Amino acid sequence: MTEALKLPVGIEDFAEIRQAGFYYVDKTKFIEQLLDGWGKVNLFTRPRRFGKTLNMSMLRYFFEIGADASLFDGLQIAKNKKLCEEYQGKYPVIFLSFKNVEGLTFADAQYRLAELIAGEAERFAFLAQSDKLTENEQSLYCGLTAVREGRYALADEVLVSALQLLSKLLSKHYGQKTIILLDEYDVPLDKAFQNGYYKEMVSLIRGMLGQALKTNEFLQFAVLTGCLRVSKESIFTGLNNFKVLSITDNRFDEQFGFTDAEVEQLLAAYNLTDHLEETKAWYDGYRFGDADVYCPWDVINHVDVLRSNPSAKPQAYWINTSGNALVKLFIEMADKSTRDELERLVAGEAIEKHIRLELTYDEIDSSIDNLWSVLFTTGYLTQKGVTEDGAYKLVIPNQEIREVYKLQIQEWFKKKVFADTEQLQSFWQAFAMGDSGAVELFLNRTLSNSISVFDAKGRDEERENSYHMLLVGLLAGKADWLVRSNVEAGEGFADIIVETDDLDDGVIVELKYAQTMTAMEKSCAKALAQIRTKRYADYLHNNGREKVLLYGIAFCKKRCRVVAEKL
């Protein structure tokens, strides 16, 4: 029964999922669409963790000669008997995932690629004695898998043609053209750019793909997946039969990621339908073509946790497996205009931008406009429509990704504020003395120069908490002060209590969020009255601190009002 099915957390092999009884969201319609919309070379670009590798594995097991046809029993593709009879198990298949092709040097990465191709070639050990091959061809195969001193010995000059050669040998053995599947094709380029050997890797990948995909008479068709559509002039020069299916294309728009119906069915299978709303808020919102989809990695992980703990809160699963360097770079490069746009995004608004879907890695950080494009293609932004002049209406897709931006903005903000030690020292001195005017001036200047996450969509309590975190961070930077947050004191919980380096002194802070600027004064008075009524000062008095300073601070957007009193 469905209830007994395990969830495939981190499993990307189609056969393992089907044979070991894991829950599988049926994406086999992808096969039918691929054959109906025929393309000699097909590139699918999607963000990471959207099921690209699993779909490629599925293609391998469907088309490959000798694969277990029963893996597809009961799945949608099995209903198309004519297609299955014509294509299933009829082709040799080369399947490579480039996700681990990396290294600090070009030589390291080059060997990882050679290792990958040699490992795939070893699956076809029968080629070494195939009577369909000449002795020279058998020798060429042995060259692909040769090992010397514990390392694959694939020569550098052979590496460029290795894919084409393997497809030729397989085709001659089987009397059938070869299908080539290349997963995460752009990872080697990304890693090369990060480590300073981009030109060398571009040359290698361009040569390899050119021979395997452009002038290869032994190719049936090829499918590539990746995050970025790398410029055709950079990698895919001369590929006239090249079809790109990006996140803006309505073809295959439901084949990567989970649809609403698929998520509802998954939750129902584990009696978790009451978690649909939170799952949607955190992990839905990606727009691929005409489809709205969820990140499958997030959904699978969330449901897996909920099975053992139904009260578990959503977590940022995708964030934890993907670097957020792009968002960090974007924030650091942002000018005042871009920071304003970023604030609007975090607040839930849409920003209109023209997007370049085709870039080279060395162009990514050359302009802020290019970064907008990369954030869109990698899933940190999505679109909810296109203007008449072709600009995309960009939004943050969901709560999980909003948390990425908020975290990176807060890190940037903290770094920026703490860089000005003189201003900070003045703020701390004014705060300890009860100089409300100086404290207010510092906070207003700080807020005006920030990227606001302090007024994003949410309840007043949530907004107040954002300002609370800001102030705690500023005060905690004073090493010889003890700063406590949400402290049980008197007849309630004080927002912030500070025990300064003067053993007789202490400070109590109560924060309020005001709906309007004019309401801030009353909010400050309300905060001070709450401190007195709830007797928060008892906490400090009990610790021998008799000189107590009270602060009522009200925030509204990027402004604040500060009132101080001595108890």
Where are the model-predicted features located?
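Substrate-engagement module of ASCE P-loop NTPases
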Residues: 121, 162-173, 200-220, 536-539
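Extended alpha-helical interface modules used as scaffolds for assembling large macromolecular complexes
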Residues: 242, 294-535, 560-567
